[in-house]
Amino acid sequence: METNVPKRKEPAKSLRIKVISMGNAEVGKSCIIKRYCEKRFVSKYLATIGIDYGVTKVQVRDREIKVNIFDMAGHPFFFEVRNEFYKDTQGVILVYDVGQKDSFDALDSWLAEMKQELGPHGNMDNIVFVVCANKIDCSKHRCIDESEGRLWAESKGFLYFETSAQTGEGINEMFQTFYLSIVDLCENGGKRPTASSSASFTKEQADTIRRIRNSKDSWEMLGVRPGASREEVNKAYRKLAVLLHPDKCVAPGSEDAFKAVVNARTALLKNIK
C-alpha cells in the first residue's frame, strides 16, 4: 500500500545584497553598523579612512541574506575613493545627526553625488533608502525634530527611523525593516515597492511645510509681499488652510504648519487697517 509522503519544501535560495552608508563625517554611520553587527558601541571617534567593508548574514523570512556592507567615509577628501562604490547597490543607509543641521541639509547633496556617479543609466528608484535620524539620545542638542526629518524622507518615498547607536534604540527595527524591503525589491524584479506613506501627501504639501518652517516672518509665511492688503492676506491664508488643514493633510509637521499660518494671519490683520 502506497502512502503519499508530502514533499519537503525546499528552502529559498540565499540572496547576496550590497548596502552602502552615506552621510557627513561624524554622524555615526560606522557606529550604527557596529551596534547592529557587533552589538556594541564605540565611544571613541575613529574616522573612516576611505571605505570600511564588512560581510554579515541575516535571516529574512525563510531566506538567508548575505549582506556586503560598504561604510563610506563622509569627508569630502575621500570622494575619489568612495565614488567607485555607488554602482550595483540595493540599499542605502542615509544618516544625519539630529544635533547638526548641516548634516541634515547635506542629505540632498549626498543623493546628488550618488546620482552623478551612477550616470545617466543609473536608476535610484530601484534602490531601497532608509534615513537614520541618529544620536537621538543627545536630546538637549537636538535641532532637527522628528516631523522635519520624517517629512523629508517620506516625501521621497524613503524609510525613516529615529536611532541611537549609543543606546541601540531603533537600530534593530531599522535594519529588519530595511532588509525586508530589499528582499521585497529583489522579489519584485528589482523594482522598489511603492511606500504607502509617500503616497499619503503631495509634494506641494511637503514643500509648503518646509517653506513655512523656514520663513523669517509672517509675510513670508503666507507668501505675500510686505504691505499686502487685507484681501490679499486672507486669500493667501485660505489657500494654505485648504492645503494644510490637519483633517485633509497627513504630512509630518502639517499641524504645526497650519497653526503657524493661523497665527501669521492673525498677526498681520491686526496691523492692517
Swiss-Prot record:
Gene Ontology terms: biological process: positive regulation of ERK1 and ERK2 cascade
InterPro entries attached to this UniProt entry: DnaJ_domain, J_dom_sf, P-loop_NTPase, Small_GTP-bd, Small_GTPase
Coarse class of the protein's main subcellular location: nucleus
Coiled-coil region list: none
Keyword field contains GTP-binding: yes
Sample GO molecular function, one term: GTPase activity
UniProt family annotation: Belongs to the small GTPase superfamily. Rab family.
Protein name in the entry: DnaJ homolog subfamily C member 27
Organism in which the protein naturally occurs: Mus musculus (Mouse)
Lineage, opening ranks: Eukaryota, Metazoa, Chordata, Craniata, Vertebrata
